[in-house]
């Protein structure tokens, strides 16, 4: 296996004011046999506050071992909660899809078999890019003629709606505290599905206590109404954030910690006095206390879930059917 990492934005392209040196990047896990393979691009969740390592490398490696070339996107998040993200994460993901597709020969990828795989708020990001890919302007001539449309989406306990079943923290980090009605509708993705929306695989648990299961039902229903191919799996029980739901996941074996890079850059900027926002000592202390809780190796309080843990196999079979692999 070859592991690669590179920024998705070139010098001067990324202007997010609270990056503090961080630039969104892709981490790739590639087979080296030169065989052309399908691709899964993983988008971790974290309420648009962080990109959680619990839904990153371990998921990419699972699909790698199923025969895919895989990537993880570490994208722009809103750790301080002072500037709404708006479309920046969506632009990050669109650029990532374009890069992977444009380098399909280099990475031995089937250019028409690229799936995005998002969890929770990462599922919202994945679905928003999947319904709005035509709206995302690309100014770099290297990628401006490359499609940002995924060939399929895997949506894992996704945030979908800005309506009654929304996840308020995700929407606030994305749109701020006073979004317009148009912004809320644009990011209420069940209202944005068209016949051109990529085929979608959804899964969630009935007992999800953070993102109500109605979110996945809303998107599945919109797919059905618009003639979009989809699969929808609802498992009987389990909390939010199950990721792979395996024993190793439950033991806190999440792999590398690179998706927490924005956390480190932000804390360092605050300590150095270079952050462009006032941060109280109490907030800094809270951040420093919270950071270790997201580190790989820290045991998760949840239990493995055998019922849910089959979802990657279901998704793999579904992708093979969609793409006639």
Predicted region positions:
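Short alpha-helix in the alpha/beta-hydrolase fold that links the catalytic acid
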Residues: 55, 189, 212-225
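Short beta-strand/loop motif that positions the catalytic acidic residue
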Residues: 196, 201-204, 208
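N-terminal cap/lid segment of alpha/beta-hydrolase-fold proteins
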Residues: 1-34, 164-168
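Primarily recognizes the serine-hydrolase "nucleophile elbow" in alpha/beta-hydrolase
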Residues: 95-170, 180, 184-185, 189
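C-terminal catalytic histidine-bearing segment of alpha/beta-hydrolase fold enzymes
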Residues: 83, 217-220, 224-325
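Catalytic nucleophile-loop/oxyanion-hole region of alpha/beta-hydrolase
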Residues: 52-53, 58, 73-111, 306
């Amino acid at each position: 296996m070859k592991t690669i990492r590179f920024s998705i934005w070139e010098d001067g392209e990324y202007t997010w004011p609270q990056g503090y040196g961080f630039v969104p990047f892709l981490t790739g896990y590639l087979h080296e046999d030169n065989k052309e393979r399908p691709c899964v691009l993983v988008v971790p969740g974290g309420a648009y506050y962080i990109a959680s390592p619990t839904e990153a490398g371990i998921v990419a490696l699972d699909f790698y071992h199923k025969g895919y070339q895989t990537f993880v996107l570490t994208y722009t998040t809103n750790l301080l909660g002072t500037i709404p993200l708006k479309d920046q994460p969506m632009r990050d993901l669109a650029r990532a899809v374009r890069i992977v597709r444009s380098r399909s020969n280099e990475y031995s990828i089937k250019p028409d078999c690229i799936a995005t795989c998002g969890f929770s708020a990462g599922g919202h990001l994945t679905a928003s890019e999947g319904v709005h890919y035509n709206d995302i302007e690309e100014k770099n001539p290297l990628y401006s003629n490359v499609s940002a449309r995924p060939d399929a989406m895997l949506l894992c306990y996704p945030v979908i709606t800005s309506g009654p079943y929304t996840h308020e923290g995700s929407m606030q980090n994305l749109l701020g505290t006073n979004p317009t009605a148009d912004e809320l509708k644009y990011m209420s993705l069940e209202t944005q599905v068209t016949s051109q929306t990529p085929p979608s695989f959804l899964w969630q648990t009935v007992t999800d206590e953070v993102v109500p299961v109605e979110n996945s039902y809303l998107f599945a229903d919109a797919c059905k109404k618009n003639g979009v191919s989809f699969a929808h799996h609802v498992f009987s029980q389990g909390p939010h954030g199950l990721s792979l739901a395996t024993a190793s996941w439950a033991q806190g074996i999440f792999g590398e910690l690179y998706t927490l890079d924005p956390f480190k850059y932000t804390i360092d900027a605050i300590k150095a006095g270079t952050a462009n926002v006032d941060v109280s000592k109490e907030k800094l202390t809270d951040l420093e206390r919270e950071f270790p809780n997201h580190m790989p190796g820290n045991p998760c309080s949840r239990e493995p879930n055998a019922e849910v843990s089959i979802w990657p196999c279901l998704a793999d079979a579904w992708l093979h059917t969609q793409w006639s692999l």
